From Swiss-Prot:
Predominant place of localization: membrane
Record-given protein name: Protoheme IX farnesyltransferase
Domain of life: Bacteria
More info: Carbon 2 of the heme B porphyrin ring is defined according to the Fischer nomenclature.
Naturally occurring in which organism (per UniProt): Mycobacterium avium (strain 104)
Pathway note: Porphyrin-containing compound metabolism; heme O biosynthesis; heme O from protoheme: step 1/1
InterPro entries registered for this protein in UniProt: Protohaem_IX_farnesylTrfase, UbiA_prenyltransferase, UbiA_sf
Family the UniProt entry places it in: Belongs to the UbiA prenyltransferase family. Protoheme IX farnesyltransferase subfamily.
Record membrane topology: Multi-pass membrane protein
Length: 308
């Protein structure tokens, strides 16, 4: 047997995991975590108690397919700027690990699969909400807003709010006011979360020509808007207490004070001309959202009496 013949068999298995990981990376698994953190508590609140585990699993599968499809299509649309930005230069399309056409087909298959799965296992409304979310994220945010306005993540962030709507509709078949309040919580939370990260990578956005707020505004202007949206986030979490028990309300107050303290600290540091660490707010904002929605899940699962 030739040397060539001996090497070839060992190369094939090593390529397969790399290809699988590249396609997995297209779905941005870290982003999908938001689905898990918010959809399950929304379902528990809608039921005010235990939800059929199979319904939860089916909703999460459909939601993950939808998020994966949207993210894959986003990678296709953003391949040119991903190559320029250091933070995204290792994404599959930026380093040519996946052909663009394959990534497009992959995203479309996941999109169709999410709609069909949710329609089949939950209800038509949930499937349509997933489809609308993907369309909004790809066409409105990625293609229309992202490269044109510094408020891109404000309006584009609406797509990230949809897991709570899908989770609620999967249980009830409708959309009611608590689902809209949960939508508002994530909607207001998204700008401070994203802008804190963008402050760290503003040079990347400038190089790519993306007018993310920190790339086109002063740090004082950015942190002022972060502060405004942080207050709106906390107020929205308190409004949700009208539909929950005392446990969620208590956690929302304590976590809200903590989140506000971090935002005020960042703003005060910028005003004073001191070195600031916006990445800390970015990381802790994840913890804040997780704590609030975990408290909501526990409060709802226990079925504590409403405060009001």
């Amino acid at each position: 047997m030739s040397v060539r013949g001996r090497v070839a068999p060992s190369q094939t298995p090593s390529r397969i995991p790399g290809t699988v990981l590249a396609y997995l990376a297209l779905t941005k698994p870290r982003v999908i975590e938001l689905l898990l953190v918010t959809a399950i508590p929304a379902m528990l609140l809608a039921q005010r108690g235990t939800v059929n585990p199979l319904l939860i699993v089916n909703t999460l599968i459909g939601g993950m397919l939808a998020a994966g499809g949207a993210n894959a299509l986003n990678c296709v649309a953003d391949a040119d700027i991903d190559k320029v930005m250091k933070r995204t230069a290792r994404r599959p399309l930026a380093r040519a690990a996946v052909p663009t056409r394959n990534a497009l087909v992959f995203g479309l298959v996941l999109t169709a699969g999410s709609f069909l799965w949710l329609w089949w296992t939950t209800n038509l409304l949930s499937g349509l909400l997933a489809l609308a979310t993907i369309a909004f994220y790809v066409f409105i945010y990625t293609l229309l807003l992202k490269r044109r306005t510094s408020q891109n993540v404000v309006w584009g962030g609406a797509a990230g709010c949809m897991p709570v709507m899908i989770g609620w509709s999967a249980v009830t078949g409708t959309i009611q006011w608590p689902a809209l309040v949960m939508f508002a919580i994530i909607f207001f939370w998204t700008p401070p979360h994203t802008w804190a990260l963008a402050m760290r990578y503003k040079d990347d956005y400038k190089a790519a020509g993306v007018p993310m707020l920190p790339a086109v505004a002063t740090e004082r202007q950015v942190t002022k808007q972060i502060l405004v949206y942080t207050w709106l986030t906390v107020l929205a979490t308190l409004a949700l207490a009208l539909a929950t028990g005392w446990l969620y309300a208590a956690v929302a107050v304590v976590a809200g004070v903590w989140f506000l303290a971090m935002a005020h600290q960042l703003y005060a540091g910028v005003r004073a001309g001191e070195p600031v660490k916006p990445l800390r707010l970015f990381l802790q904002s994840n913890n804040y959202l997780a704590v609030v929605f975990c408290a909501l899940a526990i409060d709802s699962a226990i079925g504590l009496p409403h405060l009001f």
